[in-house]
């Protein structure tokens, strides 16, 4: 595979993209299908590194599943209860937060002796707030290296009860607790401390739990009530919707250099908050239309904006590079959690935007981008972060080529991203 990829200037973007399945939905659905009673067929499952890490972990834990040849359909035989390993295990989860956090919680239900570990970057991604909450519910968890970070040793013991969890760093901690709580012996009450970030991702979790037969009552996202002693039930067939974060690159490309691009697999009915990205493009001046299972974007005269994007942290990255093509500065606010993702995305984004000529102010939890009159050809570092690679592909929508280092890092969520982009592109 190429160590670098040079994208030549693109004159026009036009066409339709059938989106790969959502990463957030795929890994949640796999775990719930494994815990549920009955067999679940998951359709449009994402085939990517993060999903493979979840599948490998479930297999090691005794879950049986059958994958179609293209790995997008998966039949999972549910265990009808807890994940329990017969012997001590070590599970390697790469850099998949959507596997590490929910599994860390789910494995606390049984009596286990399991080590969860991953790539070096995973060991820099905080998990202390989740561990604190699980311990309040009786779980025995040890840090094997640095306090508050993986790798973890999990011995089980979670019973439920009254928990508090800090909501200000990652919504995945709450997601992990919510998915685990119905299988605990006792009822669980989860109180959120601080501002709950990425709230729409909690809606994805609640939607999936409901699909598997479990309802959660919450008081304005501040207190969540979950009955204990429940069993998830397979819905039979579950369709994974397209990945809205992945859609953002194609919609932005159309806003800059359309033509018109239609992304299918998400739309008006979508459970993913990242579909709100289309509203941001519309505010900037793009033309957007919605169907039940598609979003369409056409070019418009783009203006810079100043916006709180806490609700769409992943797609907000795409706005940072779209800003290179807008008239006037763009400010993206309330995105502190960029700093604890695949890399410190605030610092990485500021560094690479400056390389292509932008004037950038990097705050603790915001970024301000002033586009240059002319973009500069540059080699873009991707920091082993799939979204950095995809965001900076948009630079090629100018008169300037761009070189993306380590383009294969997109395998985390979208292995054939560059092929899909090329298919829609007319080269200048």
Curated annotation (Swiss-Prot):
GO molecular function: 3-phosphoshikimate 1-carboxyvinyltransferase activity
CDD domains named among the record's database cross-references: EPSP_synthase
InterPro entries: Enolpyruvate_Tfrase_dom (IPR001986), Enolpyruvate_Tfrase_sf (IPR036968), EPSP_synthase (IPR006264), EPSP_synthase_CS (IPR023193), RNA3'P_cycl/enolpyr_Trfase_a/b (IPR013792)
Pfam families in alphabetical order: EPSP_synthase (PF00275)
Residues at which 3-phosphoshikimate binds: 23-24, 28, 170-172, 198, 314, 337, 341
EC number(s) from the headed UniProt entry: 2.5.1.19
Pathway(s) it belongs to: Metabolic intermediate biosynthesis; chorismate biosynthesis; chorismate from D-erythrose 4-phosphate and phosphoenolpyruvate: step 6/7
Function: Catalyzes the transfer of the enolpyruvyl moiety of phosphoenolpyruvate (PEP) to the 5-hydroxyl of shikimate-3-phosphate (S3P) to produce enolpyruvyl shikimate-3-phosphate and inorganic phosphate.
Alphabetical list of NCBIfam families matching this protein: aroA
Protein name: 3-phosphoshikimate 1-carboxyvinyltransferase
Source organism: Yersinia enterocolitica serotype O:8 / biotype 1B (strain NCTC 13174 / 8081)
């Amino acid at each position: 595979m190429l160590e670098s990829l040079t994208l030549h200037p693109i004159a026009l973007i036009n066409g339709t993209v059938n989106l790969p399945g959502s990463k957030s939905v795929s890994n949640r659905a796999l775990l719930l299908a494994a815990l549920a009673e009955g067999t679940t067929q998951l359709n449009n499952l994402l085939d990517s590194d993060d999903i493979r890490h979840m599948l490998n972990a479930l297999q090691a834990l005794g879950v049986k599943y059958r994958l179609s040849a293209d790995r997008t359909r998966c039949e999972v035989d549910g265990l009808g209860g807890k994940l329990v390993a017969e012997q001590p295990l070590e599970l390697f989860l790469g850099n998949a937060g959507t596997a590490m956090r929910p599994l860390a919680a789910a494995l606390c239900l049984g009596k286990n002796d399991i080590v969860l570990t991953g790539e070096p970057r995973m060991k820099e991604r905080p998990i202390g707030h989740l561990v604190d909450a699980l311990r309040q519910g009786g779980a025995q968890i040890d840090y094997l290296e640095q306090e508050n970070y993986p790798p973890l040793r999990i011995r089980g013991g979670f019973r439920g009860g009254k928990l508090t969890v800090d909501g200000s760093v990652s919504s995945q901690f709450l997601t992990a607790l919510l998915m685990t709580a119905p299988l605990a012996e006792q009822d669980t009450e989860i109180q959120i401390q601080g501002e709950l970030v990425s709230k729409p991702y909690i809606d994805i979790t609640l939607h999936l739990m409901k699909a598997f037969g479990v309802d959660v009552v919450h008081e304005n996202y501040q207190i969540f009530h979950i009955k204990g002693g429940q069993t998830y039930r397979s819905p039979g067939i579950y369709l994974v919707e397209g990945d809205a974060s992945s859609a953002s690159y194609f919609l932005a490309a159309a806003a800059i250099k359309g033509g018109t691009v239609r992304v299918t697999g998400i739309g008006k009915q979508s459970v993913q908050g990242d579909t709100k990205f289309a509203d941001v493009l519309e505010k900037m001046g793009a033309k957007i239309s919605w169907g039940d299972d598609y979003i369409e974007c056409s070019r418009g005269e783009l203006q810079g904006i100043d916006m709180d994007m806490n609700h769409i942290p992943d797609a907000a990255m795409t706005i940072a590079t779209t800003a290179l093509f807008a008239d006037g500065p763009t400010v993206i606010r309330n995105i502190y959690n960029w700093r604890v993702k695949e890399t410190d995305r605030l610092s990485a984004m500021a560094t690479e935007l400056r390389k292509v000529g932008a004037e950038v102010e990097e705050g603790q939890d915001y970024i301000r981008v002033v586009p240059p009159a002319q973009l500069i050809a540059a080699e873009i570092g991707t920091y082993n972060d799939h979204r950095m690679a995809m965001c900076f592909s948009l630079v090629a929508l100018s008169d300037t080529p761009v070189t993306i280092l380590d383009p294969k890092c997109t395998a985390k969520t979208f292995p054939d991203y560059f092929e899909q982009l090329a298919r829609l592109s007319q080269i200048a």
